[in-house]
Amino acid sequence: MIFFVNEDQRKTSGSTCYLEFQKGNYNDKCWLPDSISIYCELWDEHNLSDLFTHVVKDFDYFGTTKISKKQWKEIVKLSKESHQIWQEIIAEADLWVKECFKEYDIFTIIGM
């Protein structure tokens, strides 16, 4: 992966400055083995909060945000209609999200 890291890679980095994509509902535990994460500076550099808040009005950069299947489809669509970099980042996450949605109806983004 180019934009996202798995939990082993995040742990090796020694940093917690990541937004974590976690399968299902957040249950008071971070950095799960099947999560993916994106470095906060990369998120900020590409203004990904703008993309997510366009679809998820209550997106919380510093808290937790649930993303439904319907919302994800809208995020994917908007990313394709907007910036090329958004499309690339979302396409990379989409592989993980599709696997998540086989088992769960939502995933949670755990912010800073």
Positions of PLM-derived features:
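Acidic (Asp/Glu-rich) sequence patches and key acidic residues
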Residues: 1-106, 112
